[in-house]
Design a protein with these regions (language model features):
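Short structural boundary motif marking the start of a folded domain
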Residues: 2-7
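Residue-level signal for short segments within beta-strands and strand-turn junctions
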Residues: 8-10, 48
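Short N-terminal binding/cap micro-motifs at the start of the first secondary-structure element
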Residues: 13-17, 41-42
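Generic structural detector for well-ordered beta-strands
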Residues: 19-21
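Glycine-rich beta-strand-centered segment in the early N-terminal region that forms part
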Residues: 23-37, 52-110
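Disulfide-bonded cysteines in secreted/extracellular proteins and peptides
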Residues: 40, 113-115
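Short Gly/aromatic-enriched secondary-structure transition segments
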Residues: 45-53
Length: 115
């Protein structure tokens, strides 16, 4: 399995740079070679005082993840692989990402999904 480095959140003031497996691309997903990423306010608050939104005991309702989680959810890069069901973007496209894992977000209704 191919590896990548990731900033992994384990708890308040406990972020570790680790080698993790590069995830396999599922049919409705793309793989992005990240060129730039930042630390947003949510990352900072999770680092200083978390857990706030990061699930520690049970899996997140949409992502299925729990601690440890990889930080850096706002980024820019280039698509390097597309899943079999992806039709709107292609390898080589440059993209920016603010992933919000919520059903209502798909239609722009950020305020209707549970935290």
């Amino acid at each position: 399995m191919v590896k990548m480095k990731a900033a992994r959140w384990y708890g308040a003031k406990d972020v570790r740079i680790e080698e993790v497996d590069v995830p396999e691309v599922k049919p409705h997903q793309v793989k992005i070679a990240v060129k730039f990423t930042g630390i947003c306010g949510t990352d900072l608050h999770e680092y200083l005082d978390g857990p706030i939104f990061i699930p520690t005991e049970t899996e997140h309702i949409y992502s299925g993840q729990k601690v440890p989680v990889t930080l850096g959810h706002e980024f820019a890069g280039e698509i390097v692989e597309v899943g079999s069901a992806v039709t709107r973007v292609k390898v080589g496209d440059r993209v920016t990402v603010e992933p919000i894992l919520a059903k209502h977000n798909l239609v722009g209704d950020y305020n209707l999904d549970p935290i």
